[in-house]
Amino acid sequence: MKRLHPALPSCLLLVLFGIWRTAPQTHASSAGLPPLSATSFLEDLMDRYGKNDSLTLTQLKSLLDHLHVGVGRDNVSQPKEGPRNLSTCFSSGDLFAAHNLSERSQIGASEFQEFCPTILQQLDSQACTSENQKSEENEQTEEGKPSAIEVWGYGFLCVTVISLCSLMGASVVPFMKKTFYKRLLLYFIALAIGTLYSNALFQLIPEAFGFNPQDNYVSKSAVVFGGFYLFFFTEKILKMLLKQKNEHHHGHNHFTSETLPSKKDQEEGVTEKLQNGDLDHMIPQHCNSELDGKAPGTDEKVIVNSMSVQDLQASQSACYWLKGVRYSDIGTLAWMITLSDGLHNFIDGLAIGASFTVSVFQGISTSVAILCEEFPHELGDFVILLNAGMSIQQALFFNFLSACCCYLGLAFGILAGSHFSANWIFALAGGMFLYIALADMFPEMNEVCQEDEKNDSFLVPFVIQNLGLLTGFSIMLVLTMYSGQIQIG
């Protein structure tokens, strides 16, 4: 038997080893996959983000953004002189400068390989991951931030519309004793509560904490309003049921000690009654007769219970508040109302100005809430000024003058929001809105319904209250959810 050449077994082993080595590559080729190599990953990155085997600064930024590298700062910032701390998050422009490249340079495959250790170091240090979300929010804020012309223009427009509400008081004086006036006033008070409360929940307070609608806080804020509305609805239903059940156990005396105003009510209750629908008790009866086109009877008595805080002196014999009077004859309450309204309107303007520096829709939402709150307040304030001794012209002038303080607050709000953080202003306005809605206007809404409840008319005011609350809530909810999708101008 002829012996095999000694080198033949070695050759066979080499052939078998070669077939075994090429089998994975043949399988990969048959599967349509490129052969793996050190450059495969680089080629994949270049094909995904680059063009013609090169990367521009914009294309590199896209890659770095996907890796959360270089997004902690402005990506076109210039490198600073001096030693660098490697734990700092560098921008893509800084990385270009570190490799002696300009912002208009293009890097090839060999240059990109030099970037890999830098990118890996940035990923390993995690210097940019904590700043990524804040940077994206800042970029979105800068892109959607209104210009100075838009801020001042929209701000002055909204404040002007709100201030004009102070001039509407004279137009409703002849209708103060009408039933529809009380119904309309009740609706606007409920609307003001819904808008103020919802604006604080959906926009002002979340903005003070730095939230945005993408943080899914809107649904939780809606649940907060739902809890408030649930207890309001339940309380009203229980009161109606208990009233009907206990009605036959009590007499029908409408002049009990609970309904008669106390001395404190006579001195301080004028402010509390500015929208209670009982405005006929705040105006002398003979003046109401003249407003209705009737001459006062000789046996009519002048009701001055709510006017006891002023020194009427000898003015009870005529409608002195329809004529011009000296400022010294005007009651102190009128000046207190004017000053407090001026401060109130200043804070309103502050909130409007700060809101417009963030976004147009933020400013519009705040303006809508303030408008719904100012309309019923201005009507009531006008009546208070009349009862304090002012003429119609004087009441209109000082009511409008206090409303113009909103312009001053607007200017301060815009300047503060443009140069400083507006979060503190939003926090202040949010607390103020909650107080006005729940502690001020909510009791007024209940007082308006007292006369209807005495007359066993529960359903109509209850429906009006619900319509006002839900309308205000819906307006603020829609403005919050779709503020980023609707474009103005």
Swiss-Prot record:
Extracellular side: 29-155, 206-221, 371-394, 443-457
Principal place of residence: membrane
UniProt keywords, alphabetically: Cell membrane, Endosome, Glycoprotein, Ion transport, Lysosome, Membrane, Signal, Transmembrane, Transmembrane helix, Transport, Ubl conjugation, Zinc, Zinc transport
Knocked-out gene: effects: Homozygous knockout mice exhibit growth retardation and dwarfism, visible even in neonates. They exhibit moderate osteoporotic phenotypes associated with decreased bone volume and trabecular number, and increased trabecular separation. The length of the long bones is also significantly reduced. The decrease in bone mass is associated with increased bone resorption. The metabolism of these mice is also affected and they constitute a model of metabolic endotoxemia with high body fat, hypoglycemia and hyperinsulinemia.
pH profile: Optimum pH is 7.5.
Temperature dependence: Optimum temperature is 37 degrees Celsius.
Regulation: Inhibited by cyanide and therefore dependent of an energy source. Inhibited by DIDS/4,4'-diisothiocyanatostilbene-2,2'-disulfonic acid, an inhibitor hydrogencarbonate-dependent transporters.
A molecular function (GO) term: manganese ion transmembrane transporter activity
Family from the record: Belongs to the ZIP transporter (TC 2.A.5) family.
Quaternary state and interactors: Homotrimer.
Descriptive protein name: Metal cation symporter ZIP14
Gene: Slc39a14
